[in-house]
């Protein structure tokens, strides 16, 4: 199994039947990987900064506004020039936007296994060239660690403030995104770009 902490350029090509490891992928693929890493870092910096500012100056209920409105808006801002950016999780809060596809789910489950084996959560990532029904796609997934400030909305049920619980029950009646501990994998940033279209 390929190591998920990518210290050097490593591109995986995945099909329904086989997996190929290309240690020195084409320059375009290397560029995609570098650009995806930069986008994931910028996205999390912007989202985390906004969330931290709200948590320091207002009630924790305001953090829900960030996750519901600002996070999707940020993802839309970064989804341009052929790129698609979103957040996904095995325990999603927003069932319309946060549910992983088959590739994302498989890699998220792999992230969890690597986390349980002791690998640093904030270094877990995976890139691949995936053969999908509509063409070949460059895929990138970067784990999102659960930060201490996230626990007021994503922590143990008994530790979540009552006001937050009330809003969550109203806005997300099918919410699964609770019972996390600091350092666990909350989800991932998923970035993709189509390379070619199937004929």
Locate predicted features:
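Detector for the c-type heme attachment site
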Residues: 151-158
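N-terminal signal peptide c-region/cleavage motif recognized by signal peptidases
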Residues: 16-18
